[in-house]
Amino acid sequence: MKTLFKSLKITLVFCVFFSVFYILILWLFAQVAGPNKGNAEVATLDGKVVGAANVGQMFTKDIYFWGRPSCAGDGYDASSSSGSNKGPTNPEYLAEVEARIDTFLVHHPYLSRKDVPAEMVTASASGLDPNITPQCAYVQVKRVAQARGLTENQVKEIVDQSVEKPLLGIFGTEKINVLKLNIALEENK
């Protein structure tokens, strides 16, 4: 009985610590050291809020760069954030990827199947990835330039300016925030 009470006390202490104090410590750390004090990075265009730069959004028009596909609900539904949990041999998953490849090729007829980046046809683990690699942006330059009536060099220059380097030059890879890139395109009018 003595052991049971000790176990219950320890369990209670850990429950309180991890459900209150640990979360409070993380929140305080984010407020002090985190970007934007731990809050969403709000993106604006013409003084209006158009989204949060740290949450992926669906772009389907040819005048915009597209992000990774989402398996979070019906198109980037943050309340349904999760991966699909479908393995690479799952027939349903393979059919989804094939359909995404076909759709991508319809909008990018100058590409062959082997030129379609895997990242553009497979969903991220969270389903809300806001970033793509520079390679994914460069394969879309021609489509976006044609749809906007710009030269490929003009669009490529905007892409080049949107590349974010790895943290401290070593942590992570180069990436492009799709929302910020599309805002830069809109501001370039």
Curated annotation (Swiss-Prot):
Keyword Lyase among record annotations = no
GO MF terms here are: ATP binding; P-type potassium transmembrane transporter activity
In the UniProt record, the signal sequence range is none
Where is the major localization of this protein?
membrane
Cellular component aspect of the GO annotation: plasma membrane
Q: Name the InterPro entries on file.
A: KdpC
Tell me if ATP-binding is a UniProt keyword of this record: yes
Which UniProt keywords are present, listed alphabetically?
Answer: ATP-binding, Cell inner membrane, Cell membrane, Ion transport, Membrane, Nucleotide-binding, Potassium, Potassium transport, Transmembrane, Transmembrane helix, Transport
How is the protein disposed in the membrane?
Answer: Single-pass membrane protein
Transmembrane parts of this sequence: 10-30
Which spans of this chain does the record mark as coiled coil? Answer: none
Which BP terms does GO give this entry? potassium ion transmembrane transport
Where does this protein reside within or beyond the cell?
Cell inner membrane
- Subunit structure as annotated in this protein's UniProt entry: The system is composed of three essential subunits: KdpA, KdpB and KdpC.
The UniProt family comment states:
Belongs to the KdpC family.
PANTHER family this protein is in? POTASSIUM-TRANSPORTING ATPASE C CHAIN, POTASSIUM-TRANSPORTING ATPASE KDPC SUBUNIT
Q: What is the documented function of this protein?
A: Part of the high-affinity ATP-driven potassium transport (or Kdp) system, which catalyzes the hydrolysis of ATP coupled with the electrogenic transport of potassium into the cytoplasm. This subunit acts as a catalytic chaperone that increases the ATP-binding affinity of the ATP-hydrolyzing subunit KdpB by the formation of a transient KdpB/KdpC/ATP ternary complex.
Q: What is this protein called?
A: Potassium-transporting ATPase KdpC subunit
